[in-house]
Amino acid sequence: MSKRTFQPNNRRRAKVHGFRLRMRTRAGRAILAARRRKGRVELSA
């Protein structure tokens, strides 16, 4: 039997998909802007 592929880890989640990471690059800021435009309640992990 193989293990489940999703092994939750809050620290890794934030480091890979977090707000500060998104703000770091121009493309990341564009993602946040698009999500704000769309009216998302949560912008990032």
Swiss-Prot record:
Record's keyword terms, sorted: Ribonucleoprotein, Ribosomal protein
Molecular function (Gene Ontology), one example: structural constituent of ribosome
GO cellular component, one term: ribonucleoprotein complex
A single BP term in Gene Ontology: translation
PROSITE patterns in the cross-refs: RIBOSOMAL_L34
UniProt family annotation: Belongs to the bacterial ribosomal protein bL34 family.
Record protein name field: Large ribosomal subunit protein bL34
Organism (species): Beutenbergia cavernae (strain ATCC BAA-8 / DSM 12333 / CCUG 43141 / JCM 11478 / NBRC 16432 / NCIMB 13614 / HKI 0122)
